[in-house]
Curated annotation (Swiss-Prot):
GO terms for molecular function: 2-C-methyl-D-erythritol 2,4-cyclodiphosphate synthase activity; 2-C-methyl-D-erythritol 4-phosphate cytidylyltransferase activity; metal ion binding. It holds the Pfam family YgbB. Keywords: Isoprene biosynthesis, Lyase, Metal-binding, Multifunctional enzyme, Nucleotidyltransferase, Transferase. Residues 1-234 are annotated as: 2-C-methyl-D-erythritol 4-phosphate cytidylyltransferase. Pathway: Isoprenoid biosynthesis; isopentenyl diphosphate biosynthesis via DXP pathway; isopentenyl diphosphate from 1-deoxy-D-xylulose 5-phosphate: step 2/6; Isoprenoid biosynthesis; isopentenyl diphosphate biosynthesis via DXP pathway; isopentenyl diphosphate from 1-deoxy-D-xylulose 5-phosphate: step 4/6. 4-CDP-2-C-methyl-D-erythritol 2-phosphate binds at residues 241-243, 267-268, 289-291, 365-368, 372, 375. Its cofactor is a divalent metal cation. This is Bifunctional enzyme IspD/IspF. PROSITE patterns: ISPD, ISPF. It comes from Rhodopseudomonas palustris (strain BisB18).
Amino acid sequence: MSNSKRTAAIIVAGGRGLRAGAGGPKQYRSLAGQPVIFRAMQPFCTHAEIFAVQPVTSPDDAEMFKLAVAGLNYQPPAPGGATRQGSVRAGLEALAADAPDIVLIHDAARPFVDAALISRAIVAAQITGAAVPTIAVTDTIKQINAQGDVVATPDRARLRIAQTPQAFRFDVILEAHRRAAREGRDDFTDDAAIAEWAGLTVATFEGDVANMKLTTPEDFVREESRLGALLGDIRTGTGYDVHAFGDGDHVWLCGLKVPHNRGFLAHSDGDVGLHALVDAILGALADGDIGSHFPPTDPQWKGAASDKFLKYAVDRVTARGGRIANLEVTMICERPKIGPLREPMRQRIAEITGLPVARIAVKATTSERLGFTGREEGIAATASATLRLPWGTNGLAD
């Protein structure tokens, strides 16, 4: 079912996560090298059917949040409330000025959500208006009294474990939250419960066993171990590119259009920084080089923007179930000066690759006036990429 309706997502990240132990709010803790909240937000930020991602955070965490999700595109964070329910309402109100048709509400403490689950949520909301992802209960459940004695054994065939993202028509869930606030009801533990209370029929759709919520220190230990074991094949690749100057008034460097008194002589846009990164990633995959995937003899790549090449290389990693641990590029030139451009370059590479800025390094050097770069005849770049792949992969995308 195609999505002709506008869909937004709310990421609830205002909690303190005290049960997860020391180390700050759990959504900002690192999990196998990436912040939990980055993992939770990225699938929504990159999903083709979602036009806006609205985080809800504690104002006290502003700097932590900014660093943790650098490179992702999202709405300005809404300040969280005293409860999860209050935080969700704040996110809904923040979206109301440009109201979507459908809204997905997801907990930042669930970092294993994927695009398939998000797509199922969107379709479920389109069909039913209110839906929650669930998984089957596999353990026997006991109901107890205040003394801890068993008083009942519910039929587990009729029980389900609820997850997020929960999906709703925006207008109905906003009104349900507003009504709950007016009536002083602040005791709901999820948004489906508010919808039920408001008289809505809440449907279920297929959740994902992997989409677990991180709650305790043991959860972090277990998932660190699992992710480390899954991605234990560590690869490193290097790349190099050079382009001569020609006529022009700008050059493309690391995804930025940089004013200059010369241009590049190149088949594509000549971005030596991104080209070197592409070669480094492909080299780590043992998957050829940029010229084998984008031949300079092919007219379709004439003047092409090099961010397409880098996105392609990143997709090759993803296709093997891997991820990029670190990218580094060194620009070698006399001019333009790279220092003032370093942080914008890191940000742009983060936007293209979906990596946290903390995993991207941009460096610069000169050749001390020696050679073609010293004579300002062109610019060179070297790069390295460190990848983590599942054991048993051959490094080649299918």
